């Protein structure tokens, strides 16, 4: 999605300067569809949310961003005035989830995360991308847990607040064929500095 690509914008820019002749194409899709396309050789690389992604032995990855998670909530919601939000204050409020995180491990981890926060019974809503999630949240009817750096996008009508006692990080991964000898893939991967 847009967020995942955003995590590697500077590397794409640098790669394009180094290899102006290279043809770069972008394809959006769910984690499952992108992993499937990688496995079938239809893609050279994919940038995915690392939450619950299980890579087969034929794939390798680099972390493009490891980002603290925060609550994204409407700026007009009373909780937006707080510096930090306790999970119990979110009880009963619908949660907006990103449909792109469609693998069973991802869905299970996300469900477990909300359950550990005491929010197992909150109604779920689904959207196809971060902008749609932000628009739903802007209405004041729902919230979501998001990577903190999404706040840099300047999305009007939403705010980001830490969740008391919640220290999870969102990891985004560049995924590529393990041991690839393709010079384009190797050159691009070398631009991703190792992160924790």
Residue ranges and their predicted role:
Residues 1-36, 147, 186:
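N-terminal winged-helix
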Residues 11-20, 42, 106-120:
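Ligand-binding cleft/hinge of the Venus flytrap
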Residues 22-30, 119-129:
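Short beta-strand-to-loop elements that line the ligand-binding cleft
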Residues 58-69, 73-95, 183-186:
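Flexible hinge/capping segments at coil-to-helix
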Residues 7, 93-117, 182-187:
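Secondary-structure junction motif
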Residues 4, 10-14, 31-69, 73, ...:
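Short beta-strand-centered segments that line the small-molecule binding cleft or hinge
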Residues 50-51, 75, 148-150, 178:
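Short secondary-structure boundary segments
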